[in-house]
């Protein structure tokens, strides 16, 4: 009888374990990093690594190290520090990535403050009634940025580009509110010269 009871108990334990496996798998799946515009978690981890938040081997699964990296990102960008990539964090990551691509494509040869200036122009346009009101719409507005036209936008941003975006998002604006900038040597439309220049940073003139 004792042996029988042990067998019954052991079988019950195994049954519980096997019943729990689907639940565990479902929970693990929920912790994979995914979201609109992202193929898998590796892209987010790679972005976090470029930004200095994550330095482990990149995989597609969520773990403690990734959660810590996400939490640090959230704290730096004013989001609830949940450690999980929900809709708000996903949107912020995407907006930062788009802005970093523009900064890198347009100003990678400029000083850090010049890069901050380009990021500030994007944010100033979002706030202006004369431009679209989202990061994506501003960046991809027709003929708005040379880097989008000539595909330099597709280059992978470096750490400096991300840092410049963060600086601008923190309220630093060396352009004094500019919504335009240009390099006189590369101007193809004289219309830009009709804009009032507010300041010059490196090779870029920033205008209202």
Predicted regions: what they are:
Residues 2-58:
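Acidic, Ser/Thr/Pro/Gly-enriched interdomain connector segments
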Residues 30-37, 54-60, 79-81, 101-112, ...:
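Second-shell loop/turn segments in exported
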Residues 33-41, 49-68, 72, 76-91:
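Short acidic, glycine/serine/threonine-rich helix-capping segments at coil-helix boundaries
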